[in-house]
Structures are given as C-alpha cells and as structure tokens.
C-alpha cells in the first residue's frame, strides 16, 4: 500500500536527526492507528517501504548512492517486504571489492545514523565471493539470501548474486531441503514438540510463522516459486489449502503485530504479561481471562492447522526432492491400507466413506511399530473427510467398536494416540475434546493447554508399560501389569480435565461426561462408575499428599475411607503420578514422588488391615518407637540414652516423623555435648527426594522467621516444614528443602546452609539479607492470598491457614507478622504445590491462649496487607 503523503514529505525534507525522528514518530503513529482499519499485510509491507525510502535517503545523505560498486540489498523478512512494527531490519551491502577507508567511514556513519534512530539492524558488508563462502557454511545465511531484494545500487552485481543463489551447487536442492527439515526438527524440539504451551512463540513454535516460511523457502529453492500460490500449479497445493494457509498466515501476522504493539518492542513470545493487551488490540474484548481465552484458542487452532499442512507439504516435497537410493518397502496391511517405508497409506480416498476405517488406520499404526508417519496423500484425505463430517464419530456404532479396540490395544495409546491427537481425530470423535482444544489454564501449575496436558498424561501412562517406566516408576509399572482393565485408566485420563473452561467444578462435570461415555460405549455399570470416580477424585491423592500429614493415622484413615478399595487406590495412584508429571516440566520431583509413594503404601496397609480395624495413634507410636529404637540399639546406643531423649517429646512428635527420621534426630541429640545449646543437622539420606534440615533450639518467638530467612537467602526452596515443641520448652524444626530445579541440595551447599543456620541461632541480632527475584510468571496471575483463621481442637490454640503465590521471602513475611503480634508458633506445616504455597500454623497469643476475635481481625488485616504488597 502507498505511504501517506505526509510521511513521504517529512522524509524528503528531513535534514537533522530530530527531523528523521519526527518522521519516524509520525509514521509509527499512523501505522498503529491503521491496524484496526486495514489488512495487516498492507501494514507490514508499508513498514518495509518506509524503511526502503529511509535507507535510500540516508544512502544519498552519506554519499553512498554514487558508489558504482555498491548495492544495498534487503534480506530475510525485510527482503520479503514483511516488517512488523519492531522487527529487525537485515540488509547486505554488496561490494565488488573490499571498500577503501573513505567508503568504510561513510558506511559506518550510515549505520550509526540507523542506530541513532533506534532501529534494530543486522547488516554485513560482503563481496560476492565472501557471500557465497558464508552461504556455503551457513544455511541460515543461504536462506536469507534466497529472499534478497535490491533496494538501491548496482543491479548487475545483485543479479550475479541471485543467479549464484539459485544455481550454485553449494546447497543443492535436496541438501537445502534436508538442512531446513533438520533445522525445523531442532526448533520444534526446543519447544518440547508442541505449540500448545501457554506462552507460545508465534514465530518459532510448531505451527508458527517459521513453519510457513520453511514451506516457502523450499519452494523457492526447488521450484523457483515466489509465492505459495505457485505451488498449486506444481500440484502440491489445492486451492482450498492455499486459501487456508493464506488465512493462517494473515492471522499469525495479526497476532504478531498486536504483540509488538502490546510489548512496545520486537517480541515473538506471547507472554502472559502481553496477552490481555494483545487480545484487546485484536478486538477480543477487555474482559480479562475470557478475552485471552478466545484469542489463544484461535491461535492454537491456527498453529495446529499450519503444523499439519507443513507436515503434509514437506512429506510431498521429500518425495520429489530427496533422491531415492532404494525403493521403500511396500507392505499390504489389508485391502484398504498399505505400508510404504515408515508411512501408512490409504489405497483409495473412498475407503473413508466407512467412517470406522479412520480408526482402522490408527489400529494399523498400533499393530506395526515400523509405522511412524502418515503418507501425505492420506493426511490430505483425512483433512477432507474431517471437514465433511456431519455429527460426531462416536455416534456411529462401528466407530465406537473401532475406538474401543484401539484403547484396549497394547500399543493403541502410544504413537497411534499421539497421531490421532495431532490430526484432529479425537476432536472428531469426542465433542467435549473440541471444547478443550487450545483451552488456556490460568493457574500457577500448568504449562500447556488442557488438550496438550491430557495428551501428555496419556503418554505418561503408556510409559508405565515401557522399560523406562519400570526403572523410573516401579510401583506404577508393577500395578499396570496386574491391572485387569488398563483402558479404564486411559479413559479416566482422557476425561479428567475435559470439563475445564465450562465453569463449575470440572471434576464433577467431567465425571458426568465419563458416565455418559461409558453408557454409550456399553461399559458395565461398575466400569463406568470407576471411570467417573477417578475423574471426580483425580485431585484427591495429590491434595492429600501435599497438604496433609500423611504420617497421621487419622489422615490415612480418612483417605482410605474415600478410596474404599485397593483397586481404586491402584488406579488413582497411577493417574495422579501421570497427571502431575504432565502438568509442567518442573512440578514433578523426587520429593513429590516420595510423598505419593508413602501415601500409597500407608493407604494400602490401612486397606489391608480393614477400615473397621484401623491402626490407632497409640499403635503407630508404639511401632515407630520399636523400629527406631532397634535401629539405634544396632548402632550401639544405650536404651537409657534413647529413653531420656524421647521422654522430652510429646506424642505428636512420634506421629509427625518416620522411624528413620526419629532415629536420625535421636543420634544427633544423644551425641550432643550440651543439650541446652541450639544445633543443626542436614542430610540427604533421612528422606529420599529432599534435603532434610533438623534444628533443635530453646524456644524463641522470632526464631522461625530467622530460619526461613536464612534458607531463602541461600536460594533454597522450602517444600515442607514442621514445627513442634518439646515438653520442656524447646522447639524442633524440620525442613525439607530443594534446589530451584527440584533436586536435593548438593553436599557442599548443604553444609553452607547448615553453617548459616547455626550463625542465625547463635547471633540472633545479625541481619539476614537476600535478594528478591520475583519470577515473571508470578506477575502474570492476579491471585490474591487466601487467609483463614479458625479455632483449633485445643482450646488454647488457633489455626491460621494461608494460600499464596510462593514468592521469595514469603515465609519470612508471614513470620514477621506473627512476630509483630507476639504470636507463639506451636506447630506449622509448610507445603509448596507448583508455585503456590499452602501454609498451616498452630499459634497462640502472648499469653499462650487462643486468639481473640479482635486479635484475629488485626492479624488477618496485617497478613493481607503484607502479602498483597508482595504480590503486586
């Protein structure tokens, strides 16, 4: 489109730096204002034209326009004439020979002026020989030259370069193709193979702009096609596919343009911070999450279409471009399908007139591990059939039978399920799946859309049957080998989050959907109830393990009562492990593995005893004491030494800790020279999966605040904390701490933390400093702390429950409020679930009494003020 006359005049008249800046400012205001009025393609072309005119003007200003041996060439996106508001400007200065000092100085002044105008530029000065040599070594540079465009100067040299680019054998067509495919593969792998993470990169993610550009680059190199449309005449694209790709390209451009406006800079990642403003700019509204959901759902669906078309076209290109040293093996699978190499092909599009044959294709994939891909013509046929479907595939009895065969197949939920997900067959079968496709999740846990999270969960369950699963998840692997109906576990996984985004309790709504599915597919009443129960309770085990004291027999009894049977416990445990691992790449760690395993084993034991014969607290204490004492006696400790230490502990100590921990604590205390003095021990052996820190000290109100501050200052994360008091006025702290990456603390670091804690105990007045380093992700969720004060079973105690974003220093802030209000902490339970802290404190006031209503109100207000200030 033509630039406004005023922009042209301002640029023509510009003399001083301030004039150029005024011209640029006017242009960008015009550009941003036009976004809601014009097709985005016009605007990105307009910016390229504006930069063309600016460079040509400055070429004249710095007396470069009269140099006969110089050509100014746009490359990359700028060469295509596509510049988003803040995109980099890449150009090549092509010279016939190395420029002399005078010309080099002029070039330097030219480039400096562009920097002074705050333009992000990428430039190089090359002879044709140098450009060809760099092209030989660097496929990225070769690709950028493929899109080169002469802006000004020596057109003869430019044409020589263009001819070399196309005809030179340096990057033969097949070599270029293989290099671009490998480049795309590595790019996708960096994104974990999915476009559906919640902060997608519009350019680099699978299905992003790069995938579209890869198609164009290969077409230019091999077919000398300048546009996608030319692929129609070459027989690679249908008119409908060209229209679809064009529509996808325009949509991605729109979102990227809006992202630049929202960020105020060049940005390709659609970060949470930018999503609300980008959604508003794009016309999705300004109603927060709803607007963002609509925008992101459209984006994810566009990226899915691009990825599928990219996959299909590159497969077609490979057939034409890559030399065949030998014919691929062709194996007939049945009368409708054949295997060609590692691809499955439908023999005739008419096969899919019988809808159940769509699932037969995936059943063959499950049957044949050699098949890793779908033949490109078959992808095209699937796409066409998918578009013409009337109703859901589950409405056809033959499809239901085929679907059930697939989920019961030993390999059906592996690659076959992944390809079904990738090619839209789950959405074609289950209407509820269409609703979660591209569905955002606004919480502090999930890194992926609902459908992608569910896909990963299913992959995790499938892994239990694999050799890697046996070593990494031995209990789950052992369970599934004796599981009578693993398909029920898979179905619970498919439905566990299927009601997200509808409002209401997604677990209960999903259970209703699961029951309806079971009825439609003729499952027995018992099987349908099990699937629905798993969906309804899929968070139960995770919540219990991470928020409650799993060493408390009462907690185990309550959990076992809800689980009811060992069979349901087995299914729930396998589902929970797979669910947490599929949530994001950082949530699962050895500590959570240990918690869930212990809860599973405790509950299994309780169920085997019988719910009518639960182990009571006295039995548990007696058993733990016996086992811990036996350990200590075997190590050479005397019984009277052990009894003397234990006589100081209340009963809750023996329920709170395992026999291994009790033994570890006791060894330390028996060996202590002076039990009137505080002490610290640290170990990675006391509990698998985390570093244990045990602190023994005379009771002091501010002590908790100091200890958690020290741990925070050492950049360790507190996963779990317990505070217990002895009968004689001492306090016991037990922390489980991890590195930021979820690993236990290394030995050297652990000793450093131990020394710092000892210093805090012996030098209580020394200030503790630590740097606040608030994660970007915390800023992206407007989640206010939840603070609840309630009575405690003991009349002289109160319970404080706090849920908040786990910001650095959170526990310190809480402890500071407690200290300011002279509260005594008698017990605490600190848990971290994802990036949310859930903390429980048993406290009393300065008179060791329960908090009065007035005290509760003051503490509630103080906590809210302190924590809101930290999360804003």
UniProtKB/Swiss-Prot annotation:
Q: InterPro entries recorded for this chain? A: ACT-like_dom_sf, ACT_dom, HD/PDEase_dom, HD_domain, NT_sf, PII_UdlTrfase/GS_AdlTrfase, Polymerase_NTP_transf_dom, UTase/UR
Q: Which reaction does it catalyse?
A: [protein-PII]-L-tyrosine + UTP = [protein-PII]-uridylyl-L-tyrosine + diphosphate; [protein-PII]-uridylyl-L-tyrosine + H2O = [protein-PII]-L-tyrosine + UMP + H(+)
* Enzyme nomenclature, EC number: 2.7.7.59, 3.1.4.-
Q: Where is this region: Uridylyltransferase?
A: 1-332
Chain intervals for the UniProt region annotation (Uridylyl-removing): 333-691
The record ties this protein, via Pfam families, to:
GlnD_UR_UTase, HD, NTP_transf_2
GO BP, one annotated term: regulation of nitrogen utilization
Residue ranges of domain HD in the record = 450-572
The entry's free-text remark on domains says:
Has four distinct domains: an N-terminal nucleotidyltransferase (NT) domain responsible for UTase activity, a central HD domain that encodes UR activity, and two C-terminal ACT domains that seem to have a role in glutamine sensing.
Q: What is the protein name given in its UniProt record?
A: Bifunctional uridylyltransferase/uridylyl-removing enzyme
> What is the name of the gene encoding this protein?
glnD
